[in-house]
UniProtKB/Swiss-Prot annotation:
Keywords: S-adenosyl-L-methionine, Transferase. Catalyzes the conversion of S-adenosyl-L-methionine (SAM) to carboxy-S-adenosyl-L-methionine (Cx-SAM). This is Carboxy-S-adenosyl-L-methionine synthase. Pfam families: Methyltransf_25. It comes from Salmonella arizonae (strain ATCC BAA-731 / CDC346-86 / RSK2980).
């Protein structure tokens, strides 16, 4: 059962850095719906992409799976036999709830839920990889290595879905979309105090990149094609394709 996010509704004397702890995990579904514009659309469209890209006898990786929303969307849309989904997160609280969510939905495609660091996971025989609002929590210097590993582990014709909060090279555009995002959160019932305290906790942990920076990294990793397929304010998702034909 999801609870309403009121974690920051009262003043907090000492704000530390953001962590995906038990308190966050408990309210996460409400929090992300009220904080990330277009989140439900991205989740449902990840399932549509899975229907197009997941191949028989291959694996799908959901790296930074949180409570398993993307994993479940993929699982619902797989049309082939002998596929496997590997869902990974380093938060024990998230993983515990993710396992419950996966177990509650019965489907023929098996899901392995792994508590671990996505940087340590071996990617192999993958037809699809999902990084849904995950890369932004890695140190910028570590992001290229992860994308390189994903590219190498993808089969020809495979796809990476990369969803992120974006920064913008045009400061005027960045300011506009930042303000519109805050309007979105206010419209969803968050107070100025809640918005401010959460932003303070995230500012040293969630470091955003521009779409241009993401595309440059993807090219460097080897992806022959990449494009922004969804955007709402300063949030969006790219798809990157490895050339070749799926076996």
């Amino acid at each position: 059962m999801s609870h309403r996010d009121t974690l920051f509704s009262a003043p907090i004397a000492r704000l530390g850095d953001w962590t995906f702890d038990e308190r966050v995990a408990e309210v996460f579904p409400d929090m992300i719906q009220r904080s990330v514009p277009g989140y439900s659309n991205i989740i449902s469209m990840i399932g549509m992409l899975a229907e197009r890209f997941v191949q028989p006898d291959t694996q799908v990786y959901d790296l930074g799976c949180s409570l398993g929303a993307a994993t479940l969307s993929v699982r619902r849309n797989i049309r082939h036999e002998h596929c496997r989904i590997i869902a990974v997160d380093n938060s024990p609280a998230m993983i515990e709830r993710c396992r419950r969510h996966i177990d509650a939905y019965k489907a023929p495609t098996p899901v392995e839920v792994v508590e671990g660091d996505i940087r340590d996971i071996t990617i192999e025989n993958a037809s699809m990889v999902v990084l849904n609002f995950t890369l932004q929590f890695l140190e910028p210097a570590e992001r290229q290595a992860l994308l390189d590993k994903i590219y190498l582990g993808l089969n020809p014709g495979g796809a990476l879905v990369l969803s992120e909060k974006f920064s913008f090279e045009d400061a005027k555009v960045g300011e506009l979309l930042f303000n519109m995002h805050h309007d979105f959160k206010r419209a969803n019932g968050y107070s100025e105090l809640e918005i401010s305290q959460k932003r303070s906790m995230l500012e040293n942990v969630m470091l955003t990149d521009s779409v241009e920076t993401h595309k440059a990294r993807l090219r460097k990793a080897g992806f022959e094609h990449s494009e922004l397929w969804f955007q709402c304010f300063n949030f969006g998702s790219l798809v990157a394709l490895k050339a070749g034909v799926a076996a």
